[in-house]
């Protein structure tokens, strides 16, 4: 889920470079071409456009979200939930987790992004998981992370803070003071 405060892929006019928006459109076009026809030539064009956009102002993990939005069955969204989910060997094969671990620490350049995408797709195509494609994976990551967050929240609510516990002793302490 994208934070509305970071919903754009470019900086304000005074902050961005003259070709930032054109670079985004170029990436959009070559991403569609790659999704429709995965060839070495299209991968090369995609890589050049992606790497150019990668270093632009306001580009972080959101670039992977944008790719996912235009072709969700081709491009993986590497938002924080998906990264958390696919970095866990309970959710993805151990080989994948090891191969992707370092690449998920910072926004990957095109070569690493395509490798993560390809390895993840290969793991999903193997059919060992209930999620069979990137949209299913994203949905499952969202559901599981919500469950984990709710469990953490309920555990936190169950714990009584020491300050809360001490409030019960205030009347007793006051009575002892009054007795002298």
For each feature predicted by the language model, list its residue ranges.
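An N-terminal alpha-helical hairpin/helix-loop-helix interaction module that forms a charged
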Residues: 1-56, 72-179
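Short hydrophobic alpha-helical segments that form membrane-spanning helices or hydrophobic packing faces
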Residues: 63-70
